[in-house]
């Protein structure tokens, strides 16, 4: 009898703290409908595009580690380096300050200074094609229109609630632009801070092989000048990329870390001075970013 008396009291307490008119709202909050998801993704992509230029307003350190694997997937070599990203003649420039955890040798320091001076001269002459930012494969801009979006769950990430959304390419047999065709090679998972309407993390995976032409920084053998050459990269199915961002100074969303891993990579040089030789090398590239400082001083190199 005591149990029968307590049950109505328990139900009364439930009704008091969780009244029925709140039940539908709680249900909807637990799993947004497809229109709500699409609108949220459209907003965060717009914010993502607008925030990309913010990185050029900061100096920072980029800590990079490159690991190669053998045919059995075991690591066979690792190289690490730290670059100081500064503002040189008005635009970002990366200067290596550590190699494999150690300061540069006097000769390496001399080479870095020569490269900086050569780059400064080139920029003063109007040439500026020095890639600094980490290349990120994920087709984020195409998310609202070229992917089927599925809400998965909520979780806490660094103390903030984020919504996890899965993005699968739309499977349609129709003519496609180059951007649409590119998007069809990926599936992605998003971590979204809905309160800020910002993408906090993205993980992507290549689901069908994709080939890209990319500009890469190169140095002349005598270290007299730097330049950019076009290489062709084939990213195999199973290649994964990820990036996470954090809010800096309560004003800018900037990269916190990034990673890239491929089971197989085919690289073909397209420069006229090098043969087109494929290179197969499974590898992983990880980077963390730290010491962000709002740009204050531009570096100028006085010509000798």
Where are these regions (language model features)?
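Bacterial N-terminal signal peptides that target proteins for export
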Residues: 1-11
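Short, flexible coil/linker elements and helix-boundary hinge sites characteristic
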Residues: 5-6, 18-19, 126
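Bacterial N-terminal signal peptides
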Residues: 9-21
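Structured extracytoplasmic
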Residues: 25-187, 194-201, 205-241, 246-304
């Amino acid at each position: 009898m005591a149990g029968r008396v307590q049950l109505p009291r328990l139900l009364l307490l439930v009704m008091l703290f969780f009244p029925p008119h709140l039940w539908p709202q709680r249900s909807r909050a637990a799993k947004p409908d497809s229109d709500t998801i699409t609108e949220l993704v459209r907003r965060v992509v717009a914010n993502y595009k607008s925030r990309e230029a913010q990185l050029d307003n900061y100096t920072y350190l980029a800590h990079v580690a490159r690991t190669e694997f053998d045919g059995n997937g075991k690591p066979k070599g690792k190289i690490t380096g730290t670059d100081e990203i500064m503002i040189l003649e008005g635009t970002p420039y990366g200067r290596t300050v550590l190699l494999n955890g150690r300061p540069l040798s006097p000769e390496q320091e001399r080479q870095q200074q020569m490269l900086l001076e050569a780059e400064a001269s080139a920029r003063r002459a109007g040439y500026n094609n020095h890639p600094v930012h980490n290349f990120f494969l994920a087709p984020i801009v195409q998310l609202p229109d070229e992917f089927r979006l599925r809400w998965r769950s909520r979780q806490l990430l660094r103390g903030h609630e984020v919504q996890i959304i899965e993005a699968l390419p739309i499977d349609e047999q129709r003519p496609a632009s180059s951007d649409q065709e590119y998007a069809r090679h990926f599936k992605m998972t998003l971590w979204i801070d809905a309160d800020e309407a910002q993408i906090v993390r993205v993980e992507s995976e290549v689901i069908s092989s994709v080939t890209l032409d990319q500009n890469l920084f190169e140095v002349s053998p005598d270290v007299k000048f730097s330049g950019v050459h076009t290489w062709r990269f084939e990213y195999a199915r199973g290649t994964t990329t990820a990036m996470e961002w954090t809010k800096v100074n309560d004003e800018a969303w900037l990269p916190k870390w990034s990673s890239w891993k491929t089971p197989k990579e085919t690289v073909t040089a397209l420069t006229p001075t090098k043969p087109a030789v494929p290179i197969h090398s499974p590898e992983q590239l990880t980077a963390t970013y730290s010491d962000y400082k709002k740009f204050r001083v531009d570096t100028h190199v006085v010509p000798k």
